[in-house]
């Protein structure tokens, strides 16, 4: 049946030809909810039980990386190309198994004063002080919680890892204690540090974990890098 114009609509005596338009079903519309492209996955329970622990392990490992470094404040930049401190240089030499402490003191000479950084090798070995330059004092220095850091390369990683720890025992020092007390660690020549208060022994080559004594927190660790024995040291 052909509709040439509106006048043709007046002759509707035979509507049989319209059945084609009435009876034809509408073209289905695609919906991602009612007609998904991919069928629902049907994972075996055994596979799910295997994948869940792996996912949890990955998530927990990410958390461990984030918690590897302390959120406490530390800031120290030392240019050993200028200072030529041999004690620090020994600690910034890979595979040397030398850890040193650094602290800051104010010295007085007559009516004048100056600041110096004192580096001491573990085990009460060599020590050498370096006078802070004007650049050092202008950019500021924060040697951890209470004026003390431990610096050195670990022996048990390849490539070797350069560590910077706080000198305070993480299991004895409390920032909320009244009065606040200092619990400095003693660095040994064999790559360990001990606390005279709690008797714990920490392994400096493995991230500062407790090696002997009661279980507890590992050493407070800061981000650190060095460009070489007589290069630039950065702790933050």
Question: Residue ranges of each PLM-predicted region?
Answer:
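Residue-level signal for mature regions of secreted extracellular proteins and peptides
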Residues: 55, 162, 188-191
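C-terminal motif of bacterial Sec signal peptides marking the signal peptidase cleavage site
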Residues: 58-61
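N-terminal pre-ligand scaffold of iron-sulfur
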Residues: 66-185, 220-236
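Short Fe-S-cluster ligation motifs
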Residues: 196-236
């Amino acid at each position: 049946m052909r509709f040439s114009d509106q006048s043709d609509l007046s002759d509707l005596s035979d509507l049989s030809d319209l059945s084609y338009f009435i009876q034809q079903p509408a073209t289905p519309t695609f919906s991602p909810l009612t007609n998904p492209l991919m069928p629902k996955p049907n994972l075996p329970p055994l596979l799910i039980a295997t994948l869940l622990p792996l996912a949890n392990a990955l998530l927990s490992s990410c958390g461990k990386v984030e918690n590897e470094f302390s959120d406490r404040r530390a800031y120290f930049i030392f240019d050993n190309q200028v200072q030529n401190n041999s004690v620090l240089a020994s600690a910034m030499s890979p595979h040397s198994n030398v850890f040193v402490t650094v602290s800051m003191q104010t010295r007085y000479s007559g009516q004048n004063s100056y600041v110096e950084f004192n580096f001491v090798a573990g085990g009460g070995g060599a020590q050498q002080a370096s006078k802070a330059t004007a650049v050092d004092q202008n950019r500021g220095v924060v040697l951890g919680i209470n004026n003390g850091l431990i610096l050195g390369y670990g022996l048990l990683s390849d490539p070797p890892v350069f560590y910077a720890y706080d000198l305070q025992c993480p299991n004895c020092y409390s920032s909320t204690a009244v009065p606040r007390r200092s619990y400095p660690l003693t660095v040994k020549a064999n790559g360990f540090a001990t606390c005279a208060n709690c008797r714990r022994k920490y392994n400096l080559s493995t991230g500062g974990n407790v090696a002997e004594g009661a279980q507890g927190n590992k050493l407070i660790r800061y981000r650190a890098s060095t460009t070489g024995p007589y290069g630039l040291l950065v702790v933050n």
